[in-house]
Amino acid sequence: MSRVCQVTGKKPMVGNNRSHAKNSTRRRFLPNLQNHRFWLEEEKRFVQLRVSTKGIRIIDKKGIEVIVKELRARGEKV
């Protein structure tokens, strides 16, 4: 399973670790992804999404029905 938020599209990004001596080594910054079940009232079932914590806040704001409609319009299976 890829580390991509289904709502926001957040992906891992790359950067550097910096030691006290300013040595740099490459590292990855991973998004804070959660597997979360949401209840779809109109379909009377749960849908499981892999979303970032910001994605969960967006779902709280807009509503799960709106987000699922947007995901299906993009062609994602929900």
UniProtKB/Swiss-Prot annotation:
Region (Disordered), start-end ranges: 1-23
Record bears the keyword Nucleus: no
Gene3D superfamilies: Ribosomal protein L28/L24
Species name: Shewanella frigidimarina (strain NCIMB 400)
GO molecular function: structural constituent of ribosome
InterPro entries: Ribosomal_bL28, Ribosomal_bL28/bL31-like_sf, Ribosomal_bL28_bact-type, Ribosomal_bL28_sf
Protein name: Large ribosomal subunit protein bL28
Keyword Transcription: no
GO BP: any one term: translation
Record's keyword terms, sorted: Ribonucleoprotein, Ribosomal protein
